[in-house]
Amino acid sequence: MSKKIIIIAGPNGAGKTTFARSFLPEEAQCPRFINADLIAAGLAPFAPETAALKAGRLMLEEIEDCLRKGESFAFETTLSGHGYLTRIRQWREQGYHVSLFFLCLPDAETAIARVAERVRQGGHNIPEGVIRRRFAAGLRNLERAYKFAVDAWAKYDSVGESPALLEWGENQ
């Protein structure tokens, strides 16, 4: 089996972790899911936001460990920055097939409402201003850069019961 890296992306509240939990083991045969939010919840279960920086560092260390071992893995991100672009190029040069699955929401207000619902159910909060910034940046970065950097990408509408494919593409 070839080495693969799967990036589950989208705005806060888009359902990335929920999607990953069913998609990765069942559809993608990728049981290794590296998630900073889940790491933070393990470090500080009653206040995961206090462990966010440490969790982010641990996530990057775990990614590096997988790369050293030549293992396949998946991780999630909002794509609000350009930090993964250089890494994606390097991963592809190392023989990894890199796929990106982006879960869309119609607007930042929907993302804010979903995060508020997650908090009501005991999940972690994200400040409204951060959600708005990441929402705009993530979609812009997908369209301008990330979908051209990976081997394959798919964009889903994640408003309904299950994500609906909107568009997809492949690169050489």
PLM segments and residue spans:
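Walker A (P-loop) phosphate-binding loop of P-loop NTPases
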Residues: 13
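NTP-dependent small-molecule kinase module
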Residues: 144-172
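Conserved lysine of the Walker
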Residues: 16
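Extreme N-terminal starter segment of soluble prokaryotic enzymes
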Residues: 1-5
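Glycine-rich phosphate-binding loop used to anchor ATP phosphates in small-molecule kinases
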Residues: 54-105, 138
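Conserved substrate/cofactor phosphate-moiety recognition/catalytic segment
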Residues: 20-71
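A glycine- and Lys/Arg-enriched "phosphate-lid" helix/loop adjacent to the NTP-binding pocket
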Residues: 96-142
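The Walker A (P-loop) glycine that initiates the GxxxxGKT/S ATP-binding motif of P-loop NTPases
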Residues: 7-10
